[in-house]
Amino acid sequence: MTVFKIVLILIAVVVVGVVALILFALHKESNYYKYTEAVGEIEQKYTAFGDKEVSCQEYDANDDVIGKYAVWYPSELESSNTQYPVVIFANGTGSTLSTYKPFLTHLSSWGFISVGNDDENTRTGASLEETIKFLIAENEKKDSIFYHKIDLDNIGIAGHSQGGPAVFNMVTNQEHGSMVKALYAASATSSYHTMVMADGWEYDISRVNIPTFLTAGTGSWDAGNATSKEQVTD
């Protein structure tokens, strides 16, 4: 066998290996719940996929910032007269709804209408506000599959990273903030950013008066040491 053929074989093996790793990573991301080692009874139950099949509809938002809305929902909704509770998600910096598709699909498997959009800078809560307005309108459209099937009395919001300030600002600053019944923030960005960037990152969590669930990781991005007194008191 010539050196050239050996090199080609080695290149082919490497390419196949890389492709396999990429495909596995994508599979693992979409099926993250299968690889999560939940400990508590509640965590074990809800980490698993729910018993409902899930469908998705996309809508043009007619807004360059928001881009589009995507709505995941239990497939049974289309032939049901039941109203379903809602979770609206605020993206982290530079992320679009495709990043969180597995999470939103998972929520809908447990009976929620889960909604995202393509806003990559969510911190003010404005795109969450527009999403609620969109849902109110869809709930009143007789030709919509969501006509009178959205439980507007049970809306929760969630956000990751910059989406943390978004959920806080949604309930404290936006017109329909009072419609939100609970919020969740994962690795919420510090309001300390406001002092550095002065571009709308501020929020006042002391004004939030609804059930709130906050989580963060233990790595340096989430749990690094404060480097100033302002960060300590944030």
Cite the ranges covered by each PLM segment.
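N-terminal Sec-pathway targeting helices
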Residues: 1-16
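N-terminal cap/lid segment of alpha/beta-hydrolase-fold proteins
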Residues: 27-82
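Gly/Ser-rich "nucleophile elbow"/oxyanion-hole loop immediately N-terminal to the catalytic nucleophile
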Residues: 78-83, 126-165, 173-174
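Short beta-strand element of the alpha/beta-hydrolase
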Residues: 81-92
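Short amphipathic alpha-helix adjacent to the substrate-entry channel of hydrolases
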Residues: 98-117
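Hydrolases whose catalytic domains are alpha/beta-hydrolase-1, hotdog thioesterase
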Residues: 166-170, 194
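Conserved hydrolase catalytic core segment
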Residues: 170-180
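The feature captures the conserved acid-bearing segment of alpha/beta-hydrolase catalytic domains
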Residues: 181-234
